[in-house]
Amino acid sequence: MYSKRKAFLLLTKHRLSLLVVFSAVVSYVTIAESPKLSIVLYLSIGGFLITAASNAFNQVIEKNLDALMTRTKDRPMPLGVLKKKEALFFAFTITLVGLYFLYLCSVLTALIGLISMTIYVLIYTPLKKKTPWAVFVGAFPGALPTLIGAVTGQSQQNTIEFFSALLFLIQFIWQFPHFWTLAWFNYDDYAKAGFYLLPNRKKDVFSANMIFLYTIFLVAAAILPYLFNFVGVISLIIILMASFTLIFYAYLFYKYQTEDMAKKLFKACILYLPVIQLTLMTRL
């Protein structure tokens, strides 16, 4: 058991929320001609709080399911450290504060933030027990933080520019090999709660094929900014080096289809995305 202060922190999944902030801020700096420190601050606070609120609502909704799984049974809600009313009040409060800070960036930024949270909490979360297609739905809020940062940096605030859309596309496709490998090596634990999130609902050849295929799609998407002249040859070389490494691990997983190989590909995916994002940010 732990304190309520720690419980509120765990409710936010603060480490994951900080990674989301990283994607948003890097995308903002990538797109903005003259990045402003004040906007970086607003985007960081707003992005963190909206993501934290989404995670908090998710844990309230999945309290009973989390209690069934080894990886989630020690969360604040299953342990009863926080009451439902406390968690909901906290989530609603940080939602309002988060939206305010995103509004300081732009109206479109706040709107996309609200849409992202709504999809995650009201559509993706209840859909997880019903169909593997939940992963497709969840990929949208998973990638929207990149779009939030990108549109904040645009010179035109009433539209979504092409490069912003490309950044979103990369992170959108990244969600699939990332989450499916997680679902592969946590298959038995997810099954306890009735979550069957692999493409074919089970660890089989079809699911392994889809993981490998979407890794190829991800690499193809990562090259698009070069093909459309947003970055130069140096960036392309770095992207190709990172991509060949990712494909190598994807091939090993495809060949052996073990939990160990799934974990290695999962870790490779985690490293791949920030490498690509930071490379695109340099515009070299």
Label each residue range with its predicted role.
Residues 1-2, 61-82, 180-207:
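Cytosolic, membrane-interface loops and tails of multi-pass inner-membrane proteins
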Residues 22-63, 71, 95, 110-122, ...:
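Membrane-embedded alpha-helical segments that form the functional core of polytopic membrane enzymes
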